Amino acid sequence: MNHRRLSAIAAALAASAVLAACGSMGGKPSTVVELVPTGAITPNPTRGTVTFTALDHGVRVSGEVRGLVPGSEHGFHIHEKGDCGNNGDASGGHFNPTGATHGKFAAPGSHAGELPSLVADAGGVARFSVEDHSISLTDGAVNNVIGRALIVHRDRDDFTTQ
């Protein structure tokens, strides 16, 4: 298995879409993304590790994000590009290769960049493990997420805007 650890640092997006942490994906059939703080929140203790593992039909996405405000909820998305620069704007919108609508993770018609919202426990840690059947780690696949940004947003997801 090829495990590659990549990280990127980004600053704040425009006021309503500030990033808490960001990382870029690389490698396959399993890849580990290290989330590191952005300049959006100072000081910013947000850090995390997310593993994407290829399955026969989809990808297992599992990991842990630390340094969140206890009890807080955060939007969590795969973005179009793997660049977290230019105040986070370089990552583009949510990954959406089929032009689907923005909605909840695994809901019919939802776009491929949608991941479950992160909810921090009393210690400020969000742990998750889900099967995502809308993404792939396969070269050439339209829904391949390798090389894209993984973003923990400062605020909760409204399931409408990007």
What are these regions (language model features)?
Residues N2, L6, A15-Q162:
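N-terminal leader/targeting pre-sequences
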